[in-house]
Amino acid sequence: MALAPDGRFIYFQMSFFHGFFEFDLERKAIVRRAELPVPDAVKKLPLARYQLNSAHHGITMSGDGGKLCVAGTMSGYAAIVDRKTFQAHVIQVGEKPYWATTSADGRFCYVSVSSEDRVAVISFADEKPVASIRVGDHPQRVRTGKMRMIPAP
């Protein structure tokens, strides 16, 4: 789930749906739905073969709130989506992209590529991958955090 900077809109995914929804907290209603591409091979799969009932799993927002990054788990891609137009730029990242989170500075989307033991780093501005980081076995949920260092007495 991703919350817009103004606190009015939430973006979320649902099992077996290849895309996401925009929910308006003031109107208390879904106001838009984004359908993202589904590869032909995935269209032929029975739903029982979807990893953890997830067509897409993982959504995050750029630091300026202008773009979303969506992990297309069953489709092997991440999509950078313009929040106003819902125009999507699909980036092939590998097998089973499972989660997405935003870098601390808001400039990059980190997508775990669970079947390839790595995290793809995608630039929100350029809508391109800029790095691939090898990590431990089968990464799933990734988070960005900040630590406050307190000097020892």
Segment roles from a protein language model:
Residues 1-153:
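Predominantly soluble domains enriched in secretory-pathway, periplasmic, or organellar proteins
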